Amino acid sequence: MASLIEKLLRTGDKKTLRQLRNYADSINALESSFQTFTDAELREETDRLRERHQDGEKLDDLLPEAFAAVREASSRTLGMRHFDVQLMGGAALHLGNIAEMKTGEGKTLVATAPAYLNALTGNGVHVITVNDYLAEYQSDLMGRVYRFLGLTSGCILSNQDPAVRREQYAADITYGTNNEFGFDYLRDNMAWDKSELVQRGHHFAIVDEVDSILIDEARTPLIISGPAQGDTNRWYSEFAKVVTRLKPDEDYEVDEKKRTVGVLEGGIEKVEDYLGIHNLYESANTPLIGFLNNAIKAKELFKRDKDYVILDGEVLIVDEHTGRILAGRRYNEGMHQAIEAKEGVEIKAENQTLATVTLQNYFRMYNKLSGMTGTAETEAAEFMSTYKLGVVAIPTNRDMQRIDQPDLVYKNEAVKFDAVVKDIAERHEKGQPVLVGTTSVEKSEYLSRLLAKEGIRHEVLNAKNHAREAAIVAQAGRKGAVTVATNMAGRGTDIMLGGNAEFTAVAELAAKGLDPEENSEEYEAAWPAAFEAAKQAVKDEHEEVLELGGLYVLGTERHESRRIDNQLRGRSGRQGDPGESRFYLSLTDDLMRLFNSGAAERLMNSSVPDDVALESKLVSRAIASAQGQVEGRNAEQRKNVLKYDDVLNRQREAIYGDRRRILEGDDLHEKVQFFLEDTITALIDAATSEGTGDDWDFNQLWTNLKTLYPVSVTSHDVIDEAGGKSRITVDFLKEEILSDARLVYQAREQAIGSESMRELERRVVLSVIGRKWQEHLYEMDYLKEGIGLRAMAQRDPLVEYQREGFIMFQAMMEAIREESVGFLFNLEVEVTPAEDVVVADGAGEHTEHHEPQIHAAGLEAPEKPAQLQYTAPGEDGASQTRVEGRSSGRSGNPAKAAQDGARKPAPKKKKR
């Protein structure tokens, strides 16, 4: 049924393809006339198209001419002419779809035409890639096309300072990773001044490897966190003791597969008895549930000397794939502290969420979203339901000739790898290039040792050094090449039979000291000859490898996602080349062991010898079933993350919208008057909720009012004015006190000046919003941590989260209003008045207006925490954390890396 829904949701039907084909025909009809343009005339086409758009013409109508201009510019600068299917893919992107294009169809070039067309609006286009290396490489290469047409391109890289980032965002087209774009959005919404903002809106995004970014990585939200306030360490120690008294299956359940725990009724009673509390589910006790869950996870799911080690009294995480210690990394959401408490070492400060957003909600902010991938069909339903994105299957430029062989299944892993090595050796001996895909670094290194023992030269790629690995992958199609790679390694780089001419030419020019940005004219002059020489160099070898059967792709294990299996296969058979693929499996592979142990066990007990491969429908069905289970679980996880973030997203949009308007200079006078009215009304309502004037405690009410503002009218004055307590009404009381508060506010404004008062209002409200929002995020984190247990009380956790989250948000907004009013009345303020200053310079004298300067305790920009943690999905979708100042790596010059096999720090990018 799911596949039927997926087919129905795919928009790549005859009608859509006919529309795209018509666009391609229109562009082709213009090609000969565009070829007659001089370089200057082609550049002027950009100005003409921009003016026509400003005069009201729609981008859809400008598409044929814009795409024709890009095709011609690309031919002249890169020596690459867009195929018709690449133009169709570009049109699909412009229309806000996902273009499903097979590996090797030139997706990087596809993005140039829609990026150029949409950049004509002046609003900026974002092109999102999976890592820094690809962002920089594509920006450098495709930036040559944009510059030729008079546009600028930028690139966002980790560790760039805000001034550089702002410059890159100001470009017409900006490249970068999903994490960098997302973190910039969050940092902009933590800014204290308009000058700190770097982004300029979310208009049009093209997401490369869209299934990886919008599906695989969407399970992990982006989080910026800093040291938490208050003492929570006591609770970690307390709960570490509590859980030693609890027994698995009796007091709690553990699911190792999902890495989750659930507390049973008996366990809850023991915890309540130990802590001396009546009900763990009461809202006041909500934070305790998170401590309990983490303590059980630390006890059952995190094993010493496997998941972590203790060195010098410190808990250090061990990489599950490499066995290496990950210095500086800490588990988030209190997990690291729970392990420290369990081990009895010093508990280091917990981090508090300062800003967070899911990738789903970040990308849904774009006015228009599009994407490219070779494998979107299996997720078409999710793309439509989450992002309202249709999937358009673009035909290949040439017919596919790859042969996909049936899987070979062995009883155990050792025998499987023996067969793998034998197959590689046979192919290598005759010179056929081989690409071997593994699911982990550990398996890559194991296979590497086996190959070395047999004397087979090979390269191992583990997605650690993107620049160096792209250089190796680019040459993985050469005769006799053997390349072992994890699924994530070397993405975005074409494996061309005989070698990658484009990559060779880039490396050649870099070796001569030429840079496409720094030496633009020399570079463009040298490119045609370098590219032609590189093409000639690989031509003969290309023919030889074709004769040998093309690239052979060998998978050593099925991945938990069908898409990633298909991506690996797709590395072979590009652009109509011959190719072959096969998967070698064992019944002890993780996928079979965890998700279809029954089928695996039946086959294990069969009489087939260990070293004989099994080929059976039962195996195929077991694999399909296991992959279906994992995909279903992951989809449910993403859906769950999104449901909960949708609750927070509505609140985030409201708060971030207010912050942005304040930063941009909104006049808050009316809003502050509403704050004043609302706060005083709430105080009076609370004091007069029962009885009549004779029953009300006027002394207490006046005490409360004095904490808010310097009241100038006494309770006796108001009572006398009303004609006694018995005759006073709530409305009269509100009218009198509000009138007094407004007079006091006016007097304060006269004392410091209207302009200064407006600035004070902005600074106070911004400061209070910032502090209260962080407190709110902290409370929402704790609410979410314990909300799952509401299911035991027969309540829907999501509904409970929505309900309590709304109540907490209302309470936060009330606190923002009350604190803002209190500060505005009571802050001691020093004001340097506004003044007009005459300035003399070379052009003569002119007058500059200097805004009033306000100084008050607590109103300066808050001090930035010494360390900020950035948590985001890695390329495998798993959560990874880096501490600011120690980046997870920054890409280097790709061609230089190709030349010397090492990545160097990238220079600061310039707007171009």
UniProtKB/Swiss-Prot annotation:
Q: Which GO terms describe its biological process?
A: intracellular protein transmembrane transport; protein import; protein targeting; protein transport by the Sec complex
SMART domains under this entry?
SecA_DEAD, SecA_PP_bind
Keyword flag Lyase: no
Q: Which PROSITE patterns match?
A: SECA, SECA_MOTOR_DEAD
Ligand binding (ATP): 86, 104-108, 494
Provide an example Pfam family for this protein: P-loop_SecA
* Stretches the record annotates as Disordered: 860-912
Does the keyword field hold Iron-sulfur?
Answer: no
Question: How does the record say this protein sits in the membrane?
Answer: Peripheral membrane protein
Question: What domain of life does the UniProt record list for this protein's source?
Answer: Bacteria
Q: What is its main location?
A: membrane
Where in or outside the cell it occurs: the entry states: Cell membrane; Cytoplasm
Q: Which UniProt keywords apply?
A: ATP-binding, Cell membrane, Cytoplasm, Membrane, Nucleotide-binding, Protein transport, Translocase, Translocation, Transport
Cross-referenced InterPro entries, in alphabetical order? Helicase_ATP-bd, Helicase_C-like, P-loop_NTPase, SecA, SecA_CS, SecA_DEAD, SecA_motor_DEAD, SecA_preprotein_X-link_dom
Provide the function of this protein: Part of the Sec protein translocase complex. Interacts with the SecYEG preprotein conducting channel. Has a central role in coupling the hydrolysis of ATP to the transfer of proteins into and across the cell membrane, serving as an ATP-driven molecular motor driving the stepwise translocation of polypeptide chains across the membrane.
- Name of the protein described by the UniProt record: Protein translocase subunit SecA
